[in-house]
């Protein structure tokens, strides 16, 4: 998957943050608008819900990496290096969606969550296009990763009125906000979101839920490009409007 950077800023951390907020707000509003317009003949009978959650992410190795960094091994550009280690991180997010009364097992959902899987300081070994082999220390790189996903969700409401397992898949937009040597930059990448979980109904409107997510994308940030994947475990509280 070819990932194109949106824009890179020198010392424009403020401008980067403004762009980040605009993109995130636009994505959320568009997805919520879709909930009300995709199925105009049936939305009056839909079961709507919103929820918030928190948890932990456990990223896998950042693989198939190319790196450009003037501080590593005297300076390298477009070098292939070994897999990089990312930090585990706290996760926070919100979601909204609906299920149809006519098809209570099927729904659409929008999900936005954020985490900070910084690149650890580590020794990297690699090679350049001209055949030079090198080893050097890569400094820690701060990374804020926000994901917006548009999901198709399937549940099993007939199994139990109280316990409802579910699962689904969705298209995901990954917003990587990183900084290196005092410079801040934002890049957008495309990927997917797989998830499975269960809801435990407390009242006709309130439910607890636990969920596992698997994310995968090709990210490009701070002159680093590679394949990102992570496993995420979250717990949260959900409100159903039309129960």
What are these regions (language model features)?
Residues 167-174, 195-196, 207-210:
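Surface-exposed extracellular loop regions of Gram-negative outer-membrane beta-barrel proteins
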Residues 62-69, 119-127, 177-185, 220-227:
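Outer-membrane beta-barrel translocator domains and adjoining extracellular loop/strand segments
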Residues 1-47, 242-243:
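Cleavable N-terminal export/targeting peptides
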Residues 74-81, 131-137, 178-180, 218-220:
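Extracytoplasmic loops and strand-loop junctions of Gram-negative outer membrane beta-barrel proteins
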Residues 40-100, 232-243:
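Short glycine/proline- and aromatic-enriched beta-strand/turn motifs that initiate or cap beta-hairpins
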Residues 63, 80, 112-113, 117, ...:
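Predominantly the C-terminal beta-signal and adjacent terminal strand-loop region
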Residues 47, 58, 95-179, 230-243:
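Gram-negative (and chloroplast) outer-membrane scaffold detector with strong preference
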């Amino acid at each position: 998957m070819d990932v194109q950077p949106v824009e890179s800023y020198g010392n424009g951390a403020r401008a980067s943050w403004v762009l980040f907020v605009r993109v995130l707000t636009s994505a959320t509003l568009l997805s919520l608008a879709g909930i009300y317009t995709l199925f105009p003949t049936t939305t009056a009978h839909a079961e709507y819900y919103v929820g918030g959650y928190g948890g932990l992410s456990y990223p896998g190795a950042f693989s198939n990496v190319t790196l450009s960094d003037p501080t590593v091994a005297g300076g390298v550009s477009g070098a292939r290096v070994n897999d990089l280690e990312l930090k585990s991180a706290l996760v926070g997010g919100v979601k909204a969606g609906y299920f149809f009364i006519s098809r209570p097992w099927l729904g659409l959902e929008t999900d936005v969550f954020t985490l900070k899987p910084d690149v650890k300081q580590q020794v990297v070994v690699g090679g350049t296009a001209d055949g030079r082999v090198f080893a050097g220390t890569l400094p820690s790189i701060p990374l804020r990763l926000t994901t917006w996903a548009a999901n198709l969700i399937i549940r099993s409401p007939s199994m139990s009125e109280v316990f409802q397992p579910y699962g689904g898949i969705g298209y995901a937009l990954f917003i990587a906000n990183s900084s290196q040597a005092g410079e801040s930059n934002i890049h957008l990448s495309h990927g997917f979101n797989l998830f499975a979980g269960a809801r435990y109904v407390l009242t006709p409107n309130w439910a607890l839920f636990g969920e596992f997510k698997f994310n995968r994308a090709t990210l490009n940030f701070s002159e680093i490009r590679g394949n990102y994947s992570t496993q995420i475990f979250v717990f949260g509280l959900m409100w159903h409007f039309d129960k």
